[in-house]
Amino acid sequence: VSMTLLAAGGMLITASSQSLSMMILGTALTGLFSVVAQILVPLAATLATPATRGKVVGTIMSGLLLGILLARTVAGLLANLGGWRTVFWVASALMALMAVALWRGLPKLKSDTHLNYPQLLGSVFSLFIHDKLLRTRALLGCLTFANFSILWTSMAFLLAAPPFSYSEGMIGLFGLAGAAGALGARPAGGFADKGKSHLTTTFGLLLLLLSWLAIWLGHTSVLALIIGILVLDLTVQGVHITNQTVIYRLHPDARNRLTAGYMTSYFIGGAAGSLISASAWQHAGWAGVCLAGVTVALLNLLVWWRGFHRQEAVN
């Protein structure tokens, strides 16, 4: 609850900023405390029964990615109506309301861990050092989210330029296609509960690679781009849900620490994907962006091929 309110405070600072330094401060605070959303995932996994844990994780993660994608649509519409500050004013109010809802609805749980904070951080590294499957899944998450960022970072550049020349609001509507793909990935958690996580991962990574063909055709066809967005977001979310369902089985008493390590890797991939995408667009346009996406998708398949035998043991 406290972190949600602090994230809302960061948005208020950004909305009222009169200088670049003030905007950076507000954005940094929002980014720092918005990780509260990731705390809800291991909490939900802890409250769920073993037979439904994957399904529950899938539901929570679908909601998270849905928020990421629909935020683009809503932000575009709000920016058209009242400017960019309106986006942050509205978002801060919604976060404050969410804090109230969490305060009223979250159960009170006691932790069985008696480690201090430095020891907790050290134990995260220890988990990764001693568990090869955890490292494999974290790397898969890193690379899949890099694929996601490669597409979404440069897609706005493509749609704003000729021959499309779309407005901010119109570009934001493409988030609806991604949202549909994210919702379609929800059953992945159920498949993982049934011991089929290796199949969902293999199928998902192959589809991820194939999605870049439609995305490449998107430089001349909006329909092809929408199909590519649907498939890519479906596979990214499906693999992500499967990853989390698998790692939560490994150390049930350390789900928060597993989430901390896994999501750190995940967001590093997202940040790297954004940098790669912007650079590829600058130097080689949409073809360069698609080549970067294909390369990362192939790396994903290589990582999975090398770690596949470890997944069979978990199933």
What are these regions (language model features)?
Residues 1-12, 199-213, 294:
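Structural signature of the two symmetry-related core transmembrane helices
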Residues 10, 18-29, 223-231:
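Paired small-residue
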Residues 14-18, 218-219:
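Helix-breaking motifs and short loop linkers at transmembrane-helix boundaries and internal kinks
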Residues 22, 59-106:
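Helix-loop-helix hairpin linking two adjacent transmembrane segments in secondary transporters
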Residues 26-63:
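Cytoplasmic helix-loop-helix junction between adjacent transmembrane helices
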Residues 103-126:
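Flexible cytoplasmic inter-helical loops of multi-pass small-molecule transporters
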Residues 183-197, 281:
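Helix-to-loop junctions at the C-terminal end of transmembrane segments
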Residues 198-243:
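C-terminal transmembrane helical hairpin of 12-TM major facilitator-type secondary transporters
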